[in-house]
Each structure stands twice: as C-alpha cells, then as structure tokens.
Amino acid sequence: MADAIDDIVDVVVSTAPDVRDGLTGRRVYEADENPSGERQLEADVYADELLEARLLDVDAVGSYASEERESVIEADEGGRYHVAADPLDGSSNLKSNNTMGTLFGVYEEPLPAAGDALVAAGYVLYGPITTLITARDGTVTESVIDEDGTRTVVTDDLTLPSDPVVYGFGGRVPNWTPAFADYVESVASELKLRYGGAMIGDVNQVLTYGGVFGYPGLEDRPEGKLRLLFEGHPIAAIVEAAGGASSDGDGSLLKKEPEQLHERTPLFVGNDEYIERLEAALP
C-alpha cells in the first residue's frame, strides 16, 4: 500500500508546478457551471484535466472524481484506490491574486465513500511558496514543492499548537443561525480573525497557529456549502491526524458517508475545545 499511495502523492506533487504556472491567462470564466452550480474558471478546468489524466495513468488508481465533474471517471484498468479532488480550491481568489490550493483524498472504496475508507489525504497550497500537507497513518507532514516538482520535508510530524490563536468562518453573517452567531461572538472575543476565502488557506492558518475554521449550515442553506467527499473528509483527516477535531455540528466528519457524489455538509475543524464548544452551542 505504501508504494501505491506514494505514487499518487507524487503525481499531485509533480502536477503542482504545472497548475501554478498555468494560472496566468486563465482568470476568465468558462460558459459552464460545475455540478454544484458554481461558475468555472478556465483555471478550474485546466487543473482538473491535468489531475484526471495523470492520476488515472497510475496503476493503483481505479477511479477519479472531482468537484468539477458530474460523475466518477473510471480507469481503463481497475486499481485499488479511488481519488477525490478539488483541483483548485479557492479559485475565486484568482482574480484578486490570493491564496488557492489543490485538495485530494485517497479512498480504498469506490466513490462516493465513507470517511473511514479514506487512507490518505492532502493539499497543495499555492501561497508565496508552494507547500504540501499530507495526512497518512495518523501523521501529518509538511513539505515544500520546488519549481521542478521536487519536494523537501520541512515538518515530519505536524501538530496543532495547544494555544489557539486564529479563527475564520464562511457564509454571509445575516444568514448565520442565531445559535451559530452566538458561538462566533464568544470565539471572536478570544481569537484573531483570519479569513481569506479559500478553505485550504484558512485551514492552513489553523494548522499553523491553532484555532478553529468552519463553514456552517445557513438559514437559507442548512446543508452548508462545502462538499463532504472532496473537502470535508480530506480536511477532517488532516486536522484530526494533527491532533485536532472535525465536526458537522454533531460529530466527526469522518463518520459520515455521502449518499451522493457532490453532497454538501457543514464543516468545522480546529482545536478540540472549540469544536466541543461548537457542538454544545448548536441545537
């Protein structure tokens, strides 16, 4: 299993410089929307097509699914693992030249799969430098990806700081439920606001400084915005492996199994104390 997972991660790593280099000139919208009803940038489609072609070329990969596609794409030869990806998380930040990333989860069951079928997860963060966070076998590792696609481990056992510093929550404030708004008010009196509009960037702040990030169920969208398979499970696996917690407001995201490929979920991750307080605050 180890070699096969390494092969999958290596493809994501080697693709990262191509995704980053390809952002220039792809800041305009396509005519189409993705399956979640969001407008697609040319950069979304470009990153998705690169990952699909390269991951399905790995012998161990049996299928590929992404936030940008309606259905699962099967490999010609059935491999053991199934990859779910958000090829360009935070792509709406491209116009303003802010943080984006590539998020992926490796499952050992056909998609859509339950959180306990996830065997590895990770994300590439396109910031001032390009970094990779991976979670596997209960350990989180941080690496730097160079322009030629090589990676160098900089932290081999990343854990959440025990003294939380930052918080960030998505969704329009007028659409927050009263219970969630009250919770945020208490958090805001203790932590510093850090919210950049790309989940990967905001979660990376939490991993670096400790704290809490979430995108809640809203008054007009109780199911939330983020996708369980493409975003919820992988981010939950990373934060939990780093010693934190995840929740949909009721329990760990890794205990949830989507019935549909693009199923949405409220999402909260961070230090245990803030996730416990969140679950106690929500009805």
UniProtKB/Swiss-Prot annotation:
GO CC annotation terms, alphabetical: cytoplasm
Protein name in the entry: Fructose-1,6-bisphosphatase class 1
Pathway: Carbohydrate biosynthesis; gluconeogenesis
PANTHER family attached to this UniProt entry: FRUCTOSE-1,6-BISPHOSPHATASE-RELATED, SEDOHEPTULOSE-1,7-BISPHOSPHATASE, CHLOROPLASTIC
Positions that bind Mg(2+) 1: E67, D86, L88
Organismal lineage: Archaea, Methanobacteriati, Methanobacteriota, Stenosarchaea group, Halobacteria
Protein family according to the UniProt entry: Belongs to the FBPase class 1 family.
Gene3D superfamilies in UniProt: 3.40.190.80, Fructose-1,6-Bisphosphatase, subunit A, domain 1
Species whose genome carries this gene: Natronomonas pharaonis (strain ATCC 35678 / DSM 2160 / CIP 103997 / JCM 8858 / NBRC 14720 / NCIMB 2260 / Gabara)
Molecular function GO terms recorded: fructose 1,6-bisphosphate 1-phosphatase activity; magnesium ion binding
Cofactor: Mg(2+)
EC number(s) from the headed UniProt entry: 3.1.3.11
Compartment annotation: Cytoplasm
Binding site residues for Mg(2+) 2: D86, D89, E231
InterPro entries the UniProt entry points to: FBPase_C_dom, FBPase_class-1, FBPase_N, FBPtase, Fructose_bisphosphatase_AS
